[in-house]
Curated annotation (Swiss-Prot):
Family in the record: Belongs to the somatotropin/prolactin family.
GO biological process, one term: growth hormone receptor signaling pathway
Gene for this chain: gh
Function: Growth hormone plays an important role in growth control and involved in the regulation of several anabolic processes.
GO molecular function, one term: growth hormone receptor binding
GO cellular component, one term: extracellular space
CDD domains recorded: somatotropin_like (cd10285)
Disulfide bonds: C69-C177, C194-C202
The protein, known as: Somatotropin
UniProtKB keywords: Disulfide bond, Hormone, Metal-binding, Pyrrolidone carboxylic acid, Secreted, Signal, Zinc
Length: 204
C-alpha cells in the first residue's frame, strides 16, 4: 500500500513539473535570443559612435537624453523595483510590444560588422517565442485587448530626406533607442524566467 502511494506521488510530481520544465526551456531560448540582440545593438551603436568626432558624440548624447524613444509610449515599469513587482504576464506583454515596435525600423538597422539581415529575422523569432510563452499562460488571451489600438509611428521623419546633421541625429537616436529597448526586454524576460524557480533570488 505504501509503495502504491509513493508511486502515485512520484507520477503526480512528474506530471505537475512538466509544464514548468517546458516553460523554463522556452524562457531560456527567449532570453538567449534577446541577449544576442542586445549584444548586436551594443556593437552597432559602439561602431557608429566610434565613427563620430568627440564633440559630435557629446552633442548627440545631450540631445538624446532630452528626447524620447518611439517605444516610450509603451507603458513599462519605471524602475527595477516596479519591474520586480510586475507579474510574469505583464513583463511578457511589455516585452512583446517592445519587440513588435521594432519590426519595421529594424530594416534600417545596420552598421560595421552587423547587417540588417542579422537583426530582423531574430526579432521575428523572439516575438514568436514570447507569444508562445504568453499563450501558454492561462490569462494570455486577455493580454492584448487593445493591441489593435497600439499603432506606433515608424520613428517620425526618419525615412524622409534629411540634412547631414539631422540624418546623423536620427541614426544616433535609432541605434540608441534599439539598444535601450533590447536591454529592457532582456531584463523583463530574465526576471520572468527567474519567477519559474521559487527558490531563486530574482533581485536586479
Amino acid at each position: 500500500m505504501e509503495r502504491a502511494v509513493l508511486l502515485l506521488s512520484l507520477l503526480s510530481l512528474g506530471v505537475s513539473s512538466q509544464p514548468i520544465t517546458d516553460g523554463q526551456r522556452l524562457f531560456s531560448i527567449a532570453v538567449s535570443r534577446v541577449q544576442h540582440l542586445h549584444l548586436l545593438a551594443q556593437r552597432i551603436f559602439s561602431e557608429f559612435e566610434s565613427s563620430l568626432q568627440t564633440e559630435e558624440q557629446r552633442q548627440l548624447n545631450k540631445i538624446f537624453l532630452q528626447d524620447f524613444c518611439n517605444s516610450d509610449y509603451i507603458i513599462s515599469p519605471i524602475d527595477k523595483h516596479e519591474t520586480q513587482r510586475s507579474s510574469v504576464l505583464k513583463l511578457l506583454s511589455i516585452s512583446y510590444r517592445l519587440v513588435e515596435s521594432w519590426e519595421f525600423p529594424s530594416r534600417s538597422l545596420s552598421g560595421g560588422s552587423v547587417s540588417r539581415n542579422q537583426i530582423s529575422p531574430k526579432l521575428s523569432e523572439l516575438k514568436t517565442g514570447i507569444l508562445l510563452l504568453i499563450k501558454a499562460s492561462e490569462d494570455g488571451a486577455e493580454l492584448f485587448p487593445d493591441s489593435s489600438a497600439l499603432q506606433l509611428a515608424p520613428y517620425g521623419n526618419y525615412y524622409q530626406s534629411l540634412s547631414t546633421d539631422e540624418s546623423l541625429r536620427r541614426t544616433y537616436e535609432l541605434l540608441a533607442c534599439f539598444k535601450k529597448d533590447m536591454h529592457k526586454v532582456e531584463t523583463y524576460l530574465t526576471v520572468a524566467k527567474c519567477r519559474l524557480s521559487p527558490e531563486a533570488n530574482c533581485t536586479l
